[in-house]
């Protein structure tokens, strides 16, 4: 248990980071086990509200892989993936939209609004925030999408009014066809359009590791050339590939830094943003 001096010291140590990031924008991709565990979810909500209360603008982008897989299992549909990206047929697409927009998004908004009136739920469809196109254009019955365009005005409007946008990673193309888009990619594209200070991806791993079976091999700081080298060496594999790729694109689009951190660590966001050591991998140009 911390004594009063230690509590004050922690606040004092955080002050330079509070001053540095006040008024800046962070885009947080929320996913992984932190979505399934009620306690961890409450801590993420606390972190987001704390950051908002100290003057940091926060945008949340979420997927909902575990919940989607749960409901697919209920209707006897086998989840399919390609290089860490979900393959989405017509039946899966309908379920994905119901789960992400109708369940996960509204649950997050409700939790945030228990302690504030700040959260506003959106999907990529709202105000055409995200315009999608097919990730697999040669495949007819595949509604896995990618970000074609971002119309960021609605997010800017909400942020300027003090709200916390909560965005589900479902969007439509120009013809109104719905697509399921990887939430990391949506978060990266939104961060890029906002010129965000940070893009933060909450995952189930400590970050990027030279040995995926050894958490002590966490690499704390990497630049783009180092990331490309790790990809070529097949150290970065599977579901980590789209995460790293969206971080690289965001960095090239003037996002100052990207972070891949373990969302199962209590108060992971505050530890990464308001301490000098951080807890995950920080990616820069």
UniProtKB/Swiss-Prot annotation:
One Pfam family hit: AA_kinase
Role of this protein: Catalyzes the ATP-dependent phosphorylation of N-acetyl-L-glutamate.
GO CC aspect terms: chloroplast
InterPro entries in the record: AceGlu_kinase-like_sf, AcgluKinase_fam, ArgB, Asp/Glu/Uridylate_kinase, Glu/AcGlu_kinase, NAGK-C
Name this polypeptide is given: Acetylglutamate kinase
Phylogenetic placement of the source organism: Eukaryota, Rhodophyta, Florideophyceae, Rhodymeniophycidae, Gracilariales
Enzyme class of the recorded protein, top EC level: transferase
Source organism, top-level taxon: Eukaryota
Reaction(s) this enzyme catalyzes, per UniProt: N-acetyl-L-glutamate + ATP = N-acetyl-L-glutamyl 5-phosphate + ADP
Residues of the site described as Transition state stabilizer: 29, 243
Originating gene: argB
Organism: Gracilaria tenuistipitata var. liui
Keyword ATP-binding in annotation: yes
EC code(s) of this entry: 2.7.2.8
């Amino acid at each position: 248990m911390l004594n009063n001096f230690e509590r004050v010291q922690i606040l004092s140590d955080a002050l330079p980071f509070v001053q540095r990031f006040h008024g800046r924008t962070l885009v947080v991709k929320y996913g992984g086990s932190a979505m399934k565990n009620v306690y961890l979810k409450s801590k993420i909500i606390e972190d987001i509200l704390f950051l908002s209360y100290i003057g940091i603008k926060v945008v949340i982008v979420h997927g909902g892989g575990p919940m989607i897989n749960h409901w697919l299992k209920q209707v006897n549909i086998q989840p399919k993936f390609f290089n860490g990206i979900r393959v989405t047929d017509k039946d899966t697409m309908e379920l994905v939209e119901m789960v992400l927009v109708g369940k996960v998004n509204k649950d997050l908004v409700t939790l945030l609004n228990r302690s504030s009136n700040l959260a506003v739920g959106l999907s990529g469809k709202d105000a055409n925030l995200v315009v999608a196109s097919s990730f697999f254009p040669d495949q007819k019955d595949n509604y896995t999408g990618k970000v074609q365009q971002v119309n960021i005005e609605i997010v800017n409007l909400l942020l300027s009014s003090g709200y916390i946008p909560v965005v589900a990673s479902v969007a439509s193309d120009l013809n109104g066809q719905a697509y399921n888009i990887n939430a990391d990619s949506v978060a990266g594209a939104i961060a890029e359009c906002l010129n965000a200070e940070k893009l933060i991806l909450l995952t189930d791993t400590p970050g990027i590791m030279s040995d995926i079976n050894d958490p002590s091999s966490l690499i704390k700081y990497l630049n783009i050339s180092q990331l490309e080298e790790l990809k070529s060496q097949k150290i970065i594999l599977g579901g980590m590939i789209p995460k790293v790729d969206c971080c690289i694109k965001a960095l090239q689009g003037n996002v100052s830094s990207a972070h891949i951190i373990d969302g199962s660590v209590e108060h992971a966001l505050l530890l990464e943003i308001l301490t000098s050591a951080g807890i995950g991998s920080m990616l820069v140009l």
